[in-house]
Design a protein with these regions (language model features):
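NAD(P)H-binding glycine-rich loop region in Rossmannoid oxidoreductase-like domains
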Residues: 47-87, 96-99
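Conserved Rossmann-fold NAD(P)-dependent oxidoreductase catalytic core, especially the SDR/UDP-sugar
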Residues: 91-136
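Adenosine-cofactor binding site in Rossmann-like domains, unifying the SAM/SAH pocket
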Residues: 27-52
Length: 294
């Protein structure tokens, strides 16, 4: 039985950047039987809470977008939390989905799964071909484990569990917490606050040389619903825009758009992160999907 507009669909993490975009895309397409729970309602780190939720709600389809996320500093400062919390969340949800007969699950990973110095653009087959970027290896290891668990359950139990790896995201519902946000929302907040307070200079980490690709969250939501409707394979699939710019260019654009009149200082004593990260999304595009926002 295939996905229908009345199918019972659970979006884990539906208030996050990715999860809320999935929710909007589902609603836009006419899906009307959606389930979303805040962490205070169902703590996905609690095995009994997850079991009770699946037993009572009986979702037919699951988007697993719930995760503990953050930037370089958060990953460096809280490696144990990033590794354990993400492993725990995805293990509980994926296994409960198997045991309760979920028809299809989509696990949402991250582009940080790829080796630090992998060839560019990043193709799916480059997974586990070299050492990870040290600044986010804990999150990456958890996401790799999630991919492999979906593959293992497909092989052993015949579960239709798929995985998608998005590039860097931006959009409504992003996290602007200075301790836990990613590069773009962190910059937006920093330059906005500097403008409001009249600070003459803004300091950014690193050299500004790393290259990054960005995708609007609504494009991601559209892509993930497209995959849930059209893709069924063991191999995970990249989701990107195929456009990149340097962190320095990003900072200059944010500064200009916000109207910040001061200067930008680059603190090269702080880490840059991965030198370049551009996804090869040709497999997804060959299926008939392409970004609308970019």
């Amino acid at each position: 039985m295939s996905l229908t507009l009345d199918s019972k669909i659970y979006v884990a993490g539906h208030h996050g950047l990715a999860g809320s975009a999935i929710w909007r895309s589902l609603q836009h397409r006419g899906y009307r039987n959606l389930i979303g729970k805040r962490s205070r309602e169902v703590d996905l780190r609690d095995a009994q809470a997850v079991e009770a939720f699946f037993a009572s709600e009986r979702p037919e389809y699951v988007f697993l977008a719930a995760a503990k996320v953050g930037g370089i500093k958060a990953n460096n400062d809280l490696p144990g939390e990033f590794l354990l919390n993400n492993l725990t969340i995805q293990n509980h949800v994926i296994d409960a989905a198997r045991r309760h007969g979920v028809r299809k699950l989509l696990f949402l990973g991250s582009s940080c799964i790829y080796p630090r110095l992998a060839p560019q653009p990043l193709k799916e087959e480059y997974l586990l071909s070299g050492p990870l970027e040290p600044t986010n290896q804990w999150y990456a290891i958890a996401k790799i484990a999630g991919i492999k668990l979906c593959q293992a359950y497909r092989r052993q139990y015949g579960c239709d569990f798929i995985s998608a790896m998005p590039t860097n995201l931006y959009g409504p519902g992003d996290n602007y917490d200075p301790l836990g946000s990613h590069v773009l929302p962190a910059m937006i907040r920093r330059f906005h606050e500097a403008k409001v307070s009249g600070v003459p200079s803004v300091t950014c980490w690193g050299t500004g040389s790393p290259l990054r690709e960005f995708l609007h969250s609504d494009d991601l939501g559209d892509a993930l619903v497209f995959l849930m409707e059209n893709y069924s394979d063991e191999e995970f699939i990249n989701v990107g825009s195929n456009q990149e710019l340097s962190i320095r260019e990003l900072a200059e654009q944010v500064s200009r758009i916000i109207g910040y009149p001061g200067t930008i200082h680059w603190d090269s004593s702080q880490p840059d992160g991965t030198p370049r990260k551009l996804m090869d999304s040709s497999r997804l595009h060959a299926l008939g999907w392409s970004p609308k926002v970019g």
